[in-house]
Amino acid sequence: MFENQLEIQRIQKADELRNLGVNPYPHFLKKDMNIKEFREKFAYIAENETKKADEEIVISGRIKLKRVAGRSTFANIEDESGNVQIYYSKDSIGEENYLKFKKNIEVGDIILVKGYAFLTGTGEFSIHVSDLILASKAISILPEKFHGLADKELRYRQRYLDMIMDPSVRVDFEKRSLIVRTIRRFFEDRGFLEVETPMMHQIAGGANAKPFITHHNALDIDRYLKIAPELYLKRLVVGGMNSVFEMNRCFRNEGMDLTHNPEFTSIEFYWAWHNYFEAMDLTEELFNELLKTLNLGEILDYGNLKIDFSKKFQRIKYLDALVLIGEISPEIIKDKDEILKKLKSDGFEANEKLDLGHLQAELFDNYVESKLINPTFITDFPVSISPLSRRSDKDPEIAERFELYIAGKELANAFNELNDPLDQYERFKAQIEAKKAGDDEAHEMDEDYVRALSYAMPPTVGWGLGVDRLVMILLNKASIRDVILFPAMKPIKNLDDKE
């Protein structure tokens, strides 16, 4: 594996250290504080131009730069909180140790140093080292500092190296963690109970998507990795959990692009005795909380877009959006043949087997979605593309449903839940027919879920949001791979060849 000549040399140096009685991978090492805390504690030295501190402390870091000047060495070390310059010499750590480490400690190594804060002759805040311990010897060579990792694919494959070379990457994922904590706290503060539902399902349900299939050896049956937790969460509402949510991983065996990864994080909540209008209000509250927590202000940059969060989110009905935003004639959107004609004339694929609702969805995807820049709720979807949604009392062909769009991306989907078991059963049967007609993502029949509904579920609104896409918007990232620590990648035979 380690065939690079420079790596071989580093392995030899590790062996040389062992021969000198130095373990290149010691354990039970402790530090007093991180670099940020060290800088804060001794900031008075730089502020008052004091030459040095009286107190010695122990800190650690990875060597990012090293410069030897005769009997002394300057280096820059970095940890999770920041970086600082260190200085050591033959006089400060002893000639034997100095000569030992001068040759065998290099850029990339992690070291533990003991010393005091001081200002160099040029006024640079530094640590005057009195003792140095090698904490972990690096065998692989870091990329050259000023070029870093130019290959994006390598950054995703070797996220650890990406974070070493670019501390802002680590900061982004710390912000992602803050976003997740804020979401969780937001719902807990409003009385929602967090639960965990199965990751392996007997029936791939809760969303229209292609599942990953695995096999349970003990039961000798195929299982599907979770595409959505919806049907299990609604079973809990039937059982009396009236405000429930889950934030977890879901899996969909579909294509990968800038906004899709086969393994992703979503949050879903189910809220009995509330409706989709109240869910829209709650969604706006959540975004306001996130913007406040991240100190982002009301106008967000996203690529070359400006997203305005200063106003209430726009609300527009699905069919109205086709006319007003998609600029499609009202006569076309209600006629299946006219929709097919328009799609084909504009160069889009059109499946003649699709019903009117699914063809309207083709219009929406091609003519409307990308134009929804500022936060917009699209409401009242066709029932045929909403198999789990409650029908509108005013129009049985319309579902009481909304989706939230920002920057041309769908972020959230919600609806008043269908709680009529007979209607749900018929919808499942219609989905089976859709699958026969070529819809690979049509919902399967789930008789146990219908049975659960037959015990009566109170009026409930359900809501789901893609956490990864949300993080993309909040952190101004163009690719979902930039907000997932280890995104899905096509395997390569030899990582060294890629490097």
Curated annotation (Swiss-Prot):
Q: How is the cofactor bound?
A: Binds 3 Mg(2+) ions per subunit.
- UniProt: Mg(2+) 1 binding residues: 403, 410
Instruction: Summarize where Mg(2+) 2 binds, as residue positions.
Output: 410
What general EC class does the enzyme of this chain belong to?
Answer: ligase
What does the record give as the reaction this protein catalyses? tRNA(Lys) + L-lysine + ATP = L-lysyl-tRNA(Lys) + AMP + diphosphate
* Compartments where found: Cytoplasm
Pfam families, sorted: tRNA-synt_2 (PF00152), tRNA_anti-codon (PF01336)
Keywords, A to Z, come to: Aminoacyl-tRNA synthetase, ATP-binding, Cytoplasm, Ligase, Magnesium, Metal-binding, Nucleotide-binding, Protein biosynthesis
Gene Ontology biological process terms from the UniProt entry: lysyl-tRNA aminoacylation
- This one is known as Lysine--tRNA ligase
